[in-house]
Amino acid sequence: MNRLQVELPGLSLKNPIIPASGCFGFGREYAQFYDLSVLGSIMIKATTEQPRYGNPTPRVAETPGGMLNAIGLQNPGLEKVMNSELPWLEQFDLPIIANVAGSQAEDYVAVAKEISKAPNVHALELNISCPNVKTGGIAFGTNPEIAADLTKRVKEVSEVPVYVKLSPNVANIVEIAKAIENAGADGLTMINTLLGMRLDLKTAKPILANRTGGLSGPAIKPVAIRMVHEVSQAVNIPIIGMGGIETAEDVIEFFYAGASAVAVGTANFIDPFVCPTIIEELPALLDELGFDHISECQGRSWKQTCHSR
């Protein structure tokens, strides 16, 4: 029995550990360190219809407990991803989750329609929550009606299940999650980065050229846990949880909150082996906590009927 196997819409995962989009590129750099086939899946870098060069530099700043980034969805564009990056990933035994972005709804629809045809793309992740772009991005993720409409339009053209990435920079994340579920989403991924800023002590100006950036890393984990806990009780579609995950213990905490799988982001920059390390350590942690299978942990913080052996 594979104690870590997880079944989600469109995704049969040998384990629930997925490198998060934007922190793993298309996997080429990390493939120099280990066989990517050990992973549950990969959320590839956001893809837009046309190439994007991203925001001006500097666009990364360290903070206590994390980092700020304002990359601006830099990517080689749909054609390059379809003709080069996705074919390269076919050598690995794992389903790919393609992250889809755009400036307007038509962009999302165009990318989703084409990229969902790739043989190794088993699901889409709609990036409606990036805080670092002037148009699109978070603009789609802060209004329930707009988020639902975009979800519905993408579902109509996608050949694979659609997951929607939620922004924490909202007043009521549950309301948005329910609207997206009602529009036909197959799952949710959450949370994206929190909007933040750092100032230079000598100039008193923002360190990032974009002024603001997305905060990620351990600092945001309590926020992510709280939001997963709230949303998982309000919807009936699976959640891939993310936000500050660094250890096997972090993974279990997200499962307790209600996640069915997790994505590891910023920690990949600190330790390129973090994902395989977590995968290796999870079975012993399940033994320690008294669980036969990781699915027994899902929603344990609020499911009264969930008990360890």
Curated annotation (Swiss-Prot):
It is found in: Cytoplasm. CDD domains: DHOD_1B_like. InterPro entries: Aldolase_TIM (IPR013785), DHO_dehydrogenase (IPR050074), DHOD_1B (IPR033888), Dihydroorotate_DH_1 (IPR024920), Dihydroorotate_DH_1_2 (IPR012135), Dihydroorotate_DH_cat (IPR005720), Dihydroorotate_DH_CS (IPR001295), Dihydroorotate_DH_I (IPR049622). Pathway: Pyrimidine metabolism; UMP biosynthesis via de novo pathway; orotate from (S)-dihydroorotate (NAD(+) route): step 1/1. Pfam families: DHO_dh. Its cofactor is FMN. It is an enzyme of class 1 (oxidoreductase). It catalyses: (S)-dihydroorotate + NAD(+) = orotate + NADH + H(+). Substrate binds at K45, N69, A70, I71, G72, L73, N127, N192, T193. GO terms for cellular component: cytoplasm. The active site is at C130 (nucleophile). GO terms for molecular function: dihydroorotate dehydrogenase (NAD+) activity. It comes from the Bacteria. Keywords: Cytoplasm, Flavoprotein, FMN, NAD, Oxidoreductase, Pyrimidine biosynthesis. Its EC number is 1.3.1.14. One of its GO terms (biological process) is 'de novo' UMP biosynthetic process. FMN binds at S21, K45, A46, N99, N127, K165, I191, G217, G243, G244, G265, T266. Belongs to the dihydroorotate dehydrogenase family. Type 1 subfamily. This is Dihydroorotate dehydrogenase B (NAD(+)), catalytic subunit. It comes from Bacillus anthracis. The gene is pyrD.
